[in-house]
Amino acid sequence: MNNRVHQGHLARKRFGQNFLNDQFVIDSIVSAINPQKGQAMVEIGPGLAALTEPVGERLDKLTVIELDRDLAARLQTHPFLGPKLTIYQQDAMTFNFGELAEKMGQPLRVFGNLPYNISTPLMFHLFSYTDAIADMHFMLQKEVVNRLVAGPNSKAYGRLSVMAQYYCNVIPVLEVPPSAFTPPPKVDSAVVRLVPHATMPHPVKDVRVLSRITTEAFNQRRKTIRNSLGNLFSVEVLTGMGIDPAMRAENISVAQYCQMANYLAENAPLQES
């Protein structure tokens, strides 16, 4: 039997499809999301409706974004969900979540079992819409969740950690084994909750500068920041900010990266492109 076929649908490798089928895990995720009527609930990648059905049962309306046209068509004709759904058959990576929040008249509650092959770039796309998002619950590769929640001085801590924690409070919810999916992925999975900060704990003047600094630092994470960021900061400037130039990218806190970004935004602002 082909383990890539589930409920008559052949999982497409190019879409990174692995379908959730463990009822205990499904119930645990829905409880964590806790959907309520009247909320602007949005699911990315509903697939074969493992989460869509139990979430949809609690709601009058549900918006879904599904790239796979066959799966989008199945949802349109779903016996009880169909009338409740607004289906966008398009790529979540190019979706304008700000426009949708404006249309729905409230911040969005976004959730989904995300295709692992696009999860990191999709996170960065969603971070640009945190003003329009109330919270997010995602099933991701466990390694990605570890990176999202990691603190300084750990191997998992990287650019994704800094940018996620700049925008959101990041909370791990539960771990999920490969056996909970068809076909089983080759990696462990985990569910994470991301809640955009109501008030930024470390506001930056230009988030593009923060993005640039973290990219340059973590692209050369084995180097000291005296070397990896030497083109942006002198030793004197780093020392003046209370940051040891002998530290590496993984030793610097989110607050310190934001401090560095604000210094650069004031003293060497990026030109508008």
Swiss-Prot record:
The keyword Cytoplasm applies. It is found in: Cytoplasm. It catalyses: adenosine(1518)/adenosine(1519) in 16S rRNA + 4 S-adenosyl-L-methionine = N(6)-dimethyladenosine(1518)/N(6)-dimethyladenosine(1519) in 16S rRNA + 4 S-adenosyl-L-homocysteine + 4 H(+). InterPro entries: KsgA/Erm, rRNA_Ade_diMease-like_C, rRNA_Ade_Mease_Trfase_CS, rRNA_Ade_methylase_Trfase_N, rRNA_adenine_dimethylase, SAM-dependent_MTases_sf. Its EC number is 2.1.1.182. S-adenosyl-L-methionine binds at residues 18, 20, 45, 66, 91, 113. The keyword rRNA processing applies. Keywords: Cytoplasm, Methyltransferase, RNA-binding, rRNA processing, S-adenosyl-L-methionine, Transferase. GO terms for molecular function: 16S rRNA (adenine(1518)-N(6)/adenine(1519)-N(6))-dimethyltransferase activity; RNA binding. Pfam families: RrnaAD (PF00398). One of its GO terms (cellular component) is cytosol. Disulfide bonds: none annotated. It comes from the Bacteria. Its main location: cytoplasm. Belongs to the class I-like SAM-binding methyltransferase superfamily. rRNA adenine N(6)-methyltransferase family. RsmA subfamily. Specifically dimethylates two adjacent adenosines (A1518 and A1519) in the loop of a conserved hairpin near the 3'-end of 16S rRNA in the 30S particle. May play a critical role in biogenesis of 30S subunits. NCBIfam families: ksgA. This is Ribosomal RNA small subunit methyltransferase A. It comes from Escherichia coli O139:H28 (strain E24377A / ETEC).
